[in-house]
């Protein structure tokens, strides 16, 4: 579609629906579409996306274009995305979303449930609420099930799980993916070196990481891992050198 048609489509379906559509694409494909929108139009669409999805798209754009889009955004959302962009895309920090629920330990159970109800539509998941102190250091985690089953007069600090599975923001994204799978979790908190809660990574965020990791393992087993260049540009000698070991083994 032409740039004008894309802008018209975004206007007709609404920024939120258009953002959902972009989130389903490969980030590189979504970035190509965003590039054909004006900075203001791109800002509106990216604001409607989940922060982690928006960052995946922005990281594929030219830095000058990213700065222009961020200028057009609401200051709070722009700062959120700038912070996420400060982490390399292959790290846990680059994969996390800041849309999580955090509670102070002295909040009562009934108050916590009311708070969760208010923010449910804005956060990534409400299955877990993270308990932090006044300096945002991670103290524990409480599940929605635990909140519902606990007496309303008890505090979150009394019922929270203190042994929290967490990952550093600088850790490789595959470490976060493995933690989610091995521990059977729906989300894992991301913290800095001082244990301050920065964001969360949910299981759907790492599904593509796990798929890619398994694909690479299977390709390696079959000797068919991708080449460093397109087949159309590979010389016969290069192809022979890459495959001869496996061919000899198969013979």
Regions found by a protein language model. Name each.
Residues 1-226:
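Hydrophobic packing positions in regular secondary-structure scaffolds
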Residues 226, 230-251:
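Core alpha-helical transmembrane segments of integral membrane proteins
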């Amino acid at each position: 579609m032409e740039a004008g048609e894309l802008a018209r489509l975004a206007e007709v379906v609404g920024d939120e629906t258009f953002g959902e559509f972009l989130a389903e694409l490969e980030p590189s494909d979504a970035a190509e579409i965003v590039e054909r929108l004006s900075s203001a139009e791109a800002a509106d669409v990216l604001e409607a996306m989940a922060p982690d999805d928006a960052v995946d798209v922005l990281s594929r754009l030219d830095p000058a274009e990213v700065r222009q889009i961020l200028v057009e955004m609401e200051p709070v959302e722009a700062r959120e995305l700038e912070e996420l962009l400060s982490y390399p895309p292959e790290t846990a920090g680059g994969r996390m979303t800041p849309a999580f629920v955090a509670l102070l330990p002295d909040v009562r159970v009934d108050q916590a449930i009311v708070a969760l109800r208010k923010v449910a539509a804005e956060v990534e998941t409400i299955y877990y609420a993270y308990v932090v102190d006044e300096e945002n250091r991670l103290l524990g985690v409480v599940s929605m099930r635990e909140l519902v089953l606990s007496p309303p007069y008890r505090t979150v600090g009394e019922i929270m799980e203190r042994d929290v599975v967490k990952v550093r923001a600088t850790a490789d994204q595959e470490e976060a993916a493995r933690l989610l799978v091995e521990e059977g979790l729906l989300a894992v908190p991301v913290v800095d070196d001082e244990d301050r809660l920065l964001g969360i990574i949910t299981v759907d965020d790492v599904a593509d990481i796990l798929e890619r990791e398994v694909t690479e393992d299977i390709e390696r087993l079959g000797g068919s891992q991708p080449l460093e260049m397109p087949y159309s540009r590979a010389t016969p000698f290069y192809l022979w050198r890459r495959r001869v070991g496996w061919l000899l083994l198969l013979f």
